[in-house]
Amino acid sequence: MNDATPEFDVQSLRTVRAIADTGSITAAAASLGYSQPAISQHLRRLEARLGVAIVERVGRGVRLTEAGRVLARHAPAVTHAFDAVAEELAELRGLRTGVVRLVAFPSASPVLVPRLLASLAASHPGLTLTYVEAEPPEAVEAIREDRADIALTFSYPGDRDDPHGSSARGLTVRSAGRDDLLLVLPAGHSGVESVSELAEQTWIAGCPRCRGHLLELCDRAGFDPRIGFETDNAVAVEGLVAQGLGVATLPRMAVDSFPTLPGVQTSPLPSAEARGLHIVTARDAERVPSVSTVLAVLGRELAAVAGARS
């Protein structure tokens, strides 16, 4: 080996990255499932191999040195490459095992994710899929920081060509279909031919970060919506509409995740708009057999859910 080539192991890199993410050795140990002495031992072994300090004391805590920050910055790419090697070797041995980390938006949780988990359990019992809910910006960040392997995300009309802006640069973003946007109106409403007919209504909207599509929709219809209630809970949205307190839009996936409440009716937007669904991974992630398997099953389940609606 070239004397200039540093010698380190994957677990040590994961340790350094965990310290960077959590800010302390104690928190890093908890996140990795190790004891604090074990983490300290990883660090001492790594520092001995490299001949440089990785952490330094600051008051009662620690922080990464410049060398530590270099390791933390490159750790996700290096550990992903090592994982890919291990997975491919396992595939050559005929093993169908591994852990794949999925992150997806909340409205995917009630229907799509359980179907995916059940399908994988039946077809690949040795494969473990972990799942965390997150909105698209956080999901993309999880991919970039190697805290997830697959992210299921969405984007609304107007940003579909580059669904997550510069945050997804260097990642792979695949189209995964569409999720129709529905008008949510009180039961018995005669319906509308244009959203402009609802200009005088009170609107129920999501959080400020989540309502951009509604504001754009109303702007194109020539009015600013009067937002009286703010919630990201689809059941709460329908509850407010059922009491005649306002109108709203919801994605079909959210509407289909629970029985429509009495007093509510839904219909596609007159403009037939939908949010785009996307699958985000690191570059070449599909070369890892377990990730490729989950991607294939996820694609089938997305198609099955879409087909059940038609």
Stretch-by-stretch model annotation:
Residues G165-W203:
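Flexible hinge/capping segments at coil-to-helix
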Residues R17-G33:
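Short helix-boundary/capping micro-motifs
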Residues T97-D161, T231:
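Central regulatory/effector-binding core of bacterial HTH transcription factors
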Residues E47-R69:
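A short LG(V/I)-centered, amphipathic sequence patch enriched
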Residues E135-V140, R144-A148, F154, R209-Q265:
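Hydrophobic hinge/microswitch elements
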Residues D162, S166-R174, D179, V235-D284:
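Beta-alpha-beta core module
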Residues L112, V264-S310:
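A late-sequence structural motif
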Residues F154, V184-L185, V195, E200-A221, ...:
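Secondary-structure junction motif
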